[in-house]
Amino acid sequence: MKPSLFTALFATILLFHPLPGAAQQASLPDPVDGVEWRAGTAVEGGMILAKTAPGVRLELDGVSLPQDVTGHALIGFHRDSDSPVTLTILHPDGRRDSVSMMPAQRDYAVQRIDGLKRGHVTPPQEVLDRIGADSAAVRAARDVIDAGPDTGDFIAGLEMPVEGRITGVYGSQRILNGEPRQPHYGIDIAAPRGTPVMAPAAGRVTLVRDLYFSGWTFLMTHGLGLN
């Protein structure tokens, strides 16, 4: 079974706007006591914004979900969620309700490139070492949940960080010489060098680092597991 909950959810406009293809067939769960569904859809790579009644706590597949002081929480779905997830609602009087969600499936752009030299597919060891260190730093940054007073600012809406041509889309993947590469978990936007880039919402910077694959990169946490 693939993981159903992102340890870190990516700040994309997908939370508040319709998704193409299969996502249009997705929907919010049925109403349940103690929880209000505010936005989003149950779809691969998507999120649902929920708001609980006072004292209600949420667990997703047995893992407690972060909630802000107003009861907002995020439910995230993996890019390849091929199994249903279970949301448990824990009421202050001891009652427990559960909701099963089967994310709608999506089709992703897959590019196959064969005949490449091995050096273009498998980097040398020193590069692999740097990639490994980069990955560890990114994981540590994404593990930071608390955004302090800015937690939940994104609930009012997310802004595009820059205007420009979309050059990469969420979920796309390359297969080089038959070897699947890591899927793309974001949106690439091309803009001239020196163009100001704005945060999509208020938050806390958790990483500034020159990464092998993406160059100078900064990560922010917006609270509730969204970064």
Language model regions located:
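Extracellular ectodomain segments of secreted/surface proteins
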Residues: 24-49
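Short beta-strand segments within Ig-like beta-sandwich modules, predominantly Fibronectin type-III
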Residues: 63-69
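Short strand-edge motifs at loop-to-beta-strand transitions and within beta-strands
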Residues: 71-75, 187
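Surface-exposed, glycine-biased beta-strand/turn segments
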Residues: 101-216
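Conserved structural position at the C-terminal beta-strand
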Residues: 89-91
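N-terminal signal peptide c-region/cleavage motif recognized by signal peptidases
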Residues: 17-20
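Short proline/glycine-enriched turn/loop motifs at strand-loop junctions of beta-rich domains
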Residues: 49-57
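Surface-exposed, short loops/turns at beta-strand junctions within beta-sandwich domains
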Residues: 78-83
